Amino acid sequence: MSNSSNKFAVIGLGNTLRRDDGIGIVILESLLNSCKRERVDYFNFGIASFDLIYKLREYDSVLLIDGLDAGLAAGELKIFELKDISYHLKGPALSTHEFDLKSLFELYKRFELKSKIYVAGIQVQDVSFGDSLSQPLKDSLEHSISETRLFIDKTLLSF
């Protein structure tokens, strides 16, 4: 973890060529354009990689934004701590790309990361090839952005 105190990151995950799977990147880009905050670093990690684990170590708190398949209503946003993943989500697939949230959770435990990691997960409907969001995600996009922005202000920046 970083020697500097109160260091925060917001990280978008997803594949923008797989329709709803790109929702994490869409929300991240909106946040960058509308509410960039001091003390918060923003990163586009796309479909993620092991580099993400090393990036997480640099921050006290991190918010990951990602599309997920958790049996919720399409477009529904759920924000939770990564350590609570098994309590909040059901179903075999928590993420819609190769480096999923379950894998990240296992690596988080294995590497004994000290960062507090939150996940803003948005239920996907369609992850077929294409570059536009499904209608339910388009309809809920502004709500997801405003709730994510509110979470950043009230939780990450309340220290």
Predicted features and spans:
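N-terminal catalytic or cofactor-binding beta/alpha core of small enzyme domains
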Residues: 1-114, 119-124, 131-143, 147-159
